[in-house]
Amino acid sequence: MLKLSVGYQYNERFCFSKIVSDYAKNIEEVYFPWIDSASGRSMIGGYDGYFDYGLQNILLDELKRIKVMGIKLNLLFNANCYGEEAMSEVLRNKVYSVIDFLKDNEVKPDVVTTSSPAIAFVVKEQYPEIELKASVNMKISTVKGMQYVSHLFDSFCVAKECNRDVERLKTLKAWAEENNKKITMLANSGCMRDCSGQIFHDNMVAHEQDISKQKNIKFVPYMCWKYLEDKKNFVSVLQNTWIRPEDIDRYEGMVDTVKLATRAHQLPGMVIGA
């Protein structure tokens, strides 16, 4: 049975660790960003320079509850851009400080997912016991793409465009097994397939705190909104990369883990339960 990688969500309406406990036997890992850290989604507890650091204790408590269940913790450093700090000692020290803090609080991550080869390098150098996973944001979809960074990563969350290409997934999985690597796929991405605006959007998310301080133009940065205004394009929804819950078992032997996007979903428990 394929197990799930699910994204932590803080919400005043529910306790995420309780949702995890309800489906613990089906969950391999819980992925999460640290507060005040850029990732592939908005920062936890932060907006326009204000951070609710009280959430730190809530997150630590939730992570401890999850770790006791025997579920792996997957720390995210998957922002699409780290600006001028991209390969700096400052960024290295920030990464180390978060991992060391989590270790001191008995929730050391088992896995680190990143879109940055530089972050993968410094984590592997200092914490060789931590699994390094290439973010789906790296859009790796070929054996060659994995080979380029195989010295840095132990596993790969492959591009969502691979999801309905069974032969491609089999090829990726065969190479991974031969090279002691693992494959994860993202089953329910909210993005359109082959979105030409994704890199632009991901860069905006990485810099959203800075962008919020600017006098911005009237522009919708989500290409799908304009595209789907035209009804003739509705068929693209069916052509996307999302995988139906009833089809997950068909991917047994082609991937090792199925990632679910639950960090921004209103009903994460429903997604996991499905």
Language model segments and positions:
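Active-site pocket-lining/capping segments in soluble small-molecule metabolic enzymes
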Residues: 1-144, 153, 157-274
